[in-house]
Amino acid sequence: MDTLDEEQLSALKKAFDSFDTDSKGFITPETVGVILRMMGVKISEKNLQQVIAETDEDGSGELEFEEFVELAAKFLIEEDEEALKAELKEAFRIYDKGGDGYITTDVLREILRELDNRLTEDDLDGIIEEVDEDGSGTLDFDEFMEMMSG
C-alpha cells in the first residue's frame, strides 16, 4: 500500500490532536467522521462504521493515532488515485482526436517526448514495444492508464 506524505501526516496529526482535547491518545468514531469530512472525504455513515471496525485493531471502540492514520490513508490515497485517473482520462480524450477510444503509438511517442525530452528513440521504441504487446499500433484507455500509472 502507498503511504501518506509528510504534509498529509502533519494535517492528520493536527486534526487528531485538536479533537483529542483531553490528550488521552484516542478519538471517538464520530470524531473520525468529522475529521474525514473536513478533509473533503465523502463517506456514508455505514461505510465509516465498517472501516472503523476493521481499523480498530484493539477493539477499544476508539481510534489511537496510528489506527486513525491507517484509516485516513485508505481514503486519501484512494482519492489521489481517482484524481490521477481523471487527469489521465482527460489527457487521453484530448489525444484521442477521432474519439474512437484509442490513440496510435505515434501519438503515444509524442506524449512521452513531451513528458521527458531526454528519452532517446531507442527508449521510446522499447516503451512502445512493451505497451503495444499485440503490435496493433494502438492503445486503448486501459493500456494507456496502466502505462502511465505503473
From Swiss-Prot:
* PTM sites of type N-acetylmethionine: 1
Q: Which UniProt keywords apply?
A: Acetylation, Calcium, Metal-binding, Muscle protein, Repeat
- Gene Ontology MF terms: calcium ion binding
Q: Which Pfam families match?
A: EF-hand_7
- Kindly list the positions annotated as binding Ca(2+) 2: 132, 134, 136, 138, 143
Q: Which Gene3D superfamilies match?
A: EF-hand
PROSITE patterns reported in the protein's UniProt record: EF_HAND_1 (PS00018), EF_HAND_2 (PS50222)
The record's section on CDD domains has: EFh (cd00051)
Pinpoint the EF-hand domain residues.
Answer: 7-42, 43-78, 83-118, 119-150
Q: According to its record, what are the GO cellular component terms?
A: myosin II complex
Q: Which residues of this UniProt protein bind Ca(2+) 1?
A: 56, 58, 60, 62, 67
Q: Which InterPro entries match?
A: CALM/Myosin/TropC-like, EF-hand-dom_pair, EF_Hand_1_Ca_BS, EF_hand_dom
Family assignment? Belongs to the troponin C family.
Q: What does this protein do?
A: Troponin is the central regulatory protein of striated muscle contraction. Tn consists of three components: Tn-I which is the inhibitor of actomyosin ATPase, Tn-T which contains the binding site for tropomyosin and Tn-C. The binding of calcium to Tn-C abolishes the inhibitory action of Tn on actin filaments.
Please tell me what else the database record remarks about this protein.
There are two different troponin C in crayfish.
The name this protein goes by in its record: Troponin C, isotype gamma
- The organism encoding this protein is Astacus leptodactylus (Turkish narrow-clawed crayfish)
